[in-house]
Amino acid sequence: MTAYAAVFDAVSHRYGKATALDGVSVAIPAGCIAGLIGPDGVGKSTLLGLLSGVKRLRSGRIKALGGDMGSARHRRDCRVRIAYMPQGLGRNLYPTLSVVENLDFFGRLFGQPASERRARTGDLLVSTGLDPYPDRPAGKLSGGMKQKLALCCALIHEPDLLILDEPTTGVDPLSRRQFWELIGRMRVGRPGMSVVVASADMDEAAQFDWLAAMNAGRLIATGSPAEILSQTHADSLEEAFIALLPEAQRQGHKALVIPPRVPRPGPPAIEATGLTMRFGGFTAVDHVSFRIETGEIFGFLGSNGCGKSTTMKMLTGLLPPSEGTATLFGQPVDAHDLQTRKRIGYMSQSFSLYGELTVRQNLVLDAQLFDLPGAGPRIAELMEHYGLATFADSRPDSLPLGIRQRLQLAVAVLHRPGILILDEPTSGVDPVERDRFWQSLIDMSRRDGVTIFISTHFMNEAARCDRISAMNAGKVLAEGRPEDLIRARGAHTLEDAFIGYLEDAAGQPRNEQLAPARAAARAAGRPNRLFDPGRCWAYALRETMELRRDRMRLAFALLGPIVMMITFGFGISFDVKHLAYAAFDQDQSLQSRTLLQSFEGSRYFLAAAPVTDKAQMQRRLITGELALVVEVPPDFGRDLLNARTPELGIWLDGAMPFRAETTRGYVTGLMLQYFNELSVGSTGQTAQLASVNVAVRFVYNPDFLSVFAIVPGVIMLMLVLIPAMMTAVSVVQEKESGSIANFRRHLSPGWSSCSASRHLMWWWHSRASCRWR
């Protein structure tokens, strides 16, 4: 009976209205390297995410490692038997932690004691050649070294099922070869371990033991590479994949034919001499020189981070070079030379389209930016040529990846540029769309004489260029026609030739040996509890180390509460004391002066310069200079002596209603006291008021001091806000870097992915608050 690593039964998955998986049923054999192949967006990552437990199963059934992955108990029991590397360079790593600290964190997750963690870490570092860099932060490693470290973190507990989501995308061929050699040596020591890999590289997938080809969320073929080639009568896996696609999708596709280039007279289209770009102490491009003729297709070959995109940005004027010169059509590159820039078409690595606009509106906007009169016929021509007419009113975000790529190219060539600069234009696109894209480039080069400068890390694309420049670590390793470079190295393929140049640049590769397995039994026997204090402590310790190295977050955590206490304690005050007031005495009588003297004797009021007119009174109240103005009208004293009813104006600043209401109470009390004293002095009797207000009076005079009321509340507010904000920042950083998958995989159901950091920050701030108090 055939053993299976995983069995999928009618598995479906949706993201909103988009269907990622549509009833997938497949049995993946155990003990081999099984590959899921297909371009971006076909559902490979979703399938692996469901298998690893990172994503929640919504429809269908998955069996793996002897149980149902839909069961929370089984997922909890088998998580120590599964290792998962998410898509992207080192996406399961923590960039501020060193190589050893990353491994130590994963060892703690699986409950390994300190002695075993040290031994296993040393073995893995020696096996992968990372032992010279134990203290280097993961964020400062090269792409290949990040992938090796990510693999070490996945292997520290000796899993039975290793899940790799496009593990070599963007790394150089030498690092890719070393990565798979390491996997091969590891499988020699553990032949029963199953490896499931997602890959969009057909040349890489040809080395796997078993394949499942996917398209639009469905399986289109399964079997060994030889079986798939035999089934489709194809010579390469890429040709086989094209043959397996639905007829509607590959309609009109034909084999790519590249006619020879006919040299054109005139100066070179692009020429760079000693081009250098530095970012602080880091040199991204190091004295790069090349010459590209008119109508030539020139390729920049290299891994992510080698300097290709930076060089292209310098040629377009987006980045001023630190050293060196560059010319376009014989003119120096100048960011302010709009005429020269209008002769350049640029297609960035990430789609630079306007998501709020439709396909047609994106083209119209670009025509307006380049000041193209009568661009309607040109837009209609491009929409017809690139098959965009049926999508004219659709937004770019809703389009398939291949259609979006065609729109990006149409925008780049709308103004008929003489130079077309393309930065990784076909990454993630299916082979049919890639061939159509290249056919358009070949037509523009051979028919229209457009110079095309394209960067790529795909060897089959580099082989289509007239000339290529192999680049690594900001330097050009070799330049020439692809066949000449292969011949010069005595290699069989362009990849072998590139690897040879990389080995020459890096020195002889070291002989790496894989250490024997020692942690499997302990990891497999580790008890699985609903809440594991060891895992909680691992996350808390890791976040503490990250926080200590993040000066911005650390300053916010330590200084934020102090600033908040000072700001809230002294900046927010409801104290009604020493209120500035001014007199607007238009009577100047003995009675008016006696009235104003009652304010001068109160500790709640502080006299300011008198007001001379109403405009001044309004201005001083609005600016906050005064909180109270006492307006005594003309003839106030005479009306008072004649037993008339004089009017008195009290103007209050109502910007703070609480203070204004309290001030009004104080003024009312002063007025009652004044009229009572006036009545006693003139009649010998207290004043008889027409209405008597009865109010409850405490035996003490209530006094509201904000500092005693606000600051204790601020301390409690900080204990709520600061840890929550720090946790939110931490979770967002985890999600952006991709390491949030570690939370989802390793934390038990019901235990929030941010609980560890939240509890740590609560404990820390509680202690800090006690010290500050």
Residue locations for each model-derived region?
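Catalytic Walker B motif of ABC-type/P-loop ATPase nucleotide-binding domains
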Residues: L162-D165, L420-D423
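Extracytoplasmic/periplasmic domains immediately adjacent to an N-terminal transmembrane anchor
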Residues: R526-F708
